[in-house]
Amino acid sequence: MRNKEHNFPNQNNNKFEGEPRAKSEYASKRADGTTNTHPQERMRASGERSDFF
């Protein structure tokens, strides 16, 4: 059975507040288009950050 048949809340009007979580320091590419180095360190740092919610 579909969610609409069970009065599932309308999720089309979701609003996200604040700045996006994506930070340039964790990006795989730099602003000039070159590839960022040390991907393991970058991904580990991104996973350990605590600036969400």
Swiss-Prot record:
Q: Where is the composition biased (Basic and acidic residues)?
A: 16-32, 39-53
Recorded hits in InterPro entries, A to Z, give:
SASP_SspK
Q: Name one GO cellular component term.
A: endospore-forming forespore
Q: Where does the record say this protein resides?
A: Spore core
Q: What induces or represses expression of this protein, per its UniProt record?
A: Expressed only in the forespore compartment of sporulating cells.
Pfam families named in the record:
SspK
What this protein is called in its record is: Small, acid-soluble spore protein K
Name the gene behind this protein.
Answer: sspK
